[in-house]
A protein has these predicted regions:
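Edge beta-strands of extracellular beta-sandwich domains
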Residues: 125-139, 144-146
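Aromatic sugar-binding surface patches on proteins
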Residues: 101-107
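Extended substrate-binding grooves/exosites of carbohydrate-active enzymes
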Residues: 1-96, 107-112, 116-126, 150-152
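Compositionally biased low-complexity segments at domain edges in trafficked proteins
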Residues: 145-156
Length: 156
């Protein structure tokens, strides 16, 4: 968005679809290019980016990638969309440094997190939060030993 706003040859923006919709030609039968999910329950990150950039009447604050609450690996970085000024980002009780990299777009460097962590963004009166499980949450559990049948049947 930063490069597009400064380009004198760029003169318009179009949104292809407001909502995801069913499509026979697409994998899983869904065209996922919309700003809102097919069940209309969740707004995608692009929705909040456009809202932060274009809606000057209602301030916006949004932590991106909130739908992915299970995260593998301890190093995590966060992106925030805010039209209410520079946000303060808290990971548990720690404050994370936030830098603006484009209009209404902020990010943090990677930080080391572990376990269940609540991430909170604060910008003026606005609040947004997400609870993440970070670490080796995606690895399958190991079995204690080989499985044995209680009464094995003899085979021929």
């Amino acid at each position: 968005a930063k490069n597009l706003q400064n380009d004198s040859l760029f003169w318009g923006t179009w949104i292809n679809n407001m909502f995801d919709y069913g499509s026979v030609r697409r994998p899983y039968g869904v065209n996922g290019a919309g700003l809102v999910t097919i069940d209309r329950r969740e707004r995608k990150d692009a929705f909040y980016l456009y809202k932060a950039l274009w809606n000057k009447e209602e301030p916006t604050l949004h932590i991106t990638d909130k739908r992915r609450t299970l995260r593998d690996g301890e190093r995590q970085a966060f992106h925030i969309y805010s039209s209410a000024g520079a946000p303060t980002l808290l990971a548990g009780a720690d404050t994370l440094a936030v830098t603006e990299y484009a209009t209404c777009q902020y990010r943090t460097d990677s930080v080391s997190l572990r376990g269940t962590v609540e991430i909170k963004a604060i910008a003026g009166p606005l609040r947004d939060s997400v609870t993440l499980r970070v670490g080796n949450v995606l690895k399958p559990k190991r079995l204690q030993g080989p499985r044995r049948t209680v009464n094995p049947q003899p085979t021929n």
